């Protein structure tokens, strides 16, 4: 089973799954250098260095370099995208949503990345995306290789006016894209201002 974890953060959505399922091979993408380092340490400590591969790349719908915005508190909010201007209204009290600096990172479309780094992969069994405002861009960046994806999850704002980042996709845009490309949204889980859309390929 091939698992992709785009925006792996601390590995909360992939380390345990990979450890407890010896048939899983995970490709984790995390552009924050310190988090990527900790993921590699965790994978080695759990004895799965050969099945848990960490790439310090950002994933989107273009290839090249871009500014990756680092944040003060919540490292899970670091993003290629800038924060929206109305966060004091839509996310009251979240003073940790403050950029502390930016660094240039390598950005890949997933179809390009697969061709360069893992051309042997022909099926992605599960694609977990938490790319902080770029989730739909990650899917679009698969191009024709989107047909390889069997299931996955993307994060979306619950309402258009609750977008955390400038230019972020809407929930409806994500739902429309999934339907147009042969997926069914089979579950939604919610957290503050955001929903996780789980999807599977139509049979």
Residue ranges and their predicted role:
Residues 1-203:
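Phosphate/nucleotide-binding beta-alpha loop and adjacent structural elements of enzyme active sites
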């Amino acid at each position: 089973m091939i698992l992709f974890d785009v925006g792996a953060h601390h590995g909360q959505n992939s380390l345990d799954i990979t450890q407890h399922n010896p048939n899983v091979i995970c490709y984790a993408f995390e552009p924050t250098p310190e988090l990527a380092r900790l993921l590699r340490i965790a994978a080695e400590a759990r004895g799965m260095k050969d099945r848990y591969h960490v790439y310090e790349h950002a994933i989107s719908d273009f290839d090249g370099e871009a500014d990756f915005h680092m944040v003060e508190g919540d490292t899970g909010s670091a993003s290629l995208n800038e924060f929206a201007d109305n966060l004091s209204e839509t996310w009251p009290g979240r003073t940790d949503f403050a950029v502390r600096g930016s660094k240039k990172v390598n950005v890949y479309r997933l179809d390009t990345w697969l061709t360069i780094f893992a051309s042997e992969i022909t099926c992605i069994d599960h694609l977990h995306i938490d790319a902080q405002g770029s989730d739909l861009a990650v899917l679009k960046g698969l191009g024709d290789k989107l047909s390889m994806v069997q299931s996955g999850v993307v994060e979306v704002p619950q309402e258009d006016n609750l977008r955390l980042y400038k230019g972020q996709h809407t929930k409806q845009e994500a739902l429309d894209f999934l339907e147009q490309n042969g997926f069914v949204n089979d579950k939604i889980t919610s957290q503050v201002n955001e929903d996780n859309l789980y999807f599977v390929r139509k049979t």
